[in-house]
């Protein structure tokens, strides 16, 4: 992988006129879920994504305390590995009558509260860090509305896992796929992530 650029929070000051030339690069978050890490609840992750032409095409999400790794790649599928045991991720193929919405233990904005009111009856599952996407990929939840600030390194690896399992991550306002390195700042727009059964 020599010669492939690397972007992370620690390297966030790379100038846009340099970054905009990148076709392929690694996007890394060595500690996603800082609040979860401080609380010592185990729900923090290490995220590594491969971005190609604005798309997260491969990703690894590692939860050290849980000894669990989620990984996936475009056209190849997605898997969960616990120790030596590996299983494919296929999500829940049929939408539940009462959707399970995954959110953060540390963030629940008024916009998300309004969104939840609009979807009607639902169950709420609180999980930290990129594990929210992974719950969708596993079929343990259906929807993840993130109507608050995130950075590109917070989402890319887990988006790759979820989409490799058949899910989707789209911008809240436009409905277009969430993309990377398409503008000078590294902040994501609001987005909605959906499990395979909801990814219409």
Q: Predicted segment positions?
A:
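Flexible, acidic active-site loops/lids enriched in D/E/S/T/G that coordinate Mg2+ and/or position polar
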Residues: 1-52, 60
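Conserved beta-strand segments of alpha/beta enzyme cores
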Residues: 5, 120-123, 168
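Short loop/edge segments at beta-strand edges and connector loops
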Residues: 8-10, 82, 128, 173
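Short, solvent-exposed loop/turn elements at beta->coil junctions and helix N-caps
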Residues: 10-16, 131-132, 176-181
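Conserved acidic residues
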Residues: 23-25, 57, 99, 142
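Acidic beta-strand-loop-alpha-helix segment within the catalytic core
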Residues: 48-134, 182-200
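Oxyanion/phosphate-interacting regions
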Residues: 114-118, 134-200
């Amino acid at each position: 992988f020599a010669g492939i650029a690397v972007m992370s929070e620690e390297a966030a000051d790379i100038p846009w006129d340099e970054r905009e030339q990148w076709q392929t690069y690694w996007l890394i978050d060595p500690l996603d879920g800082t609040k979860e890490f401080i609380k010592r609840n185990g729900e923090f992750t290490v995220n590594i994504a491969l971005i190609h032409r604005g798309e997260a095409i491969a990703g690894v999400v590692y939860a050290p305390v849980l000894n669990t790794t989620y990984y996936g790649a475009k056209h190849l599928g997605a898997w969960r590995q616990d120790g030596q045991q590996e299983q494919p991720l296929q999500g829940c193929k049929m939408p539940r009558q009462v959707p399970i919405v995954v959110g953060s233990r540390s963030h629940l904005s008024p916009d998300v509260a309004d969104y939840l009111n609009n979807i009607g009856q639902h169950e709420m599952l609180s999980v930290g860090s990129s594990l929210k996407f992974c719950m969708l990929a596993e079929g343990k939840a259906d929807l993840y509305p993130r109507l608050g600030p995130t950075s590109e390194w917070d989402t890319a690896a887990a988006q790759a896992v979820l989409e490799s399992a058949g899910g989707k991550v789209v911008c809240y306002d436009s409905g277009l796929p969430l993309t990377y390195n398409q503008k000078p700042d590294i902040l994501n727009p609001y987005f909605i992530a959906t499990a395979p059964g909801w990814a219409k």
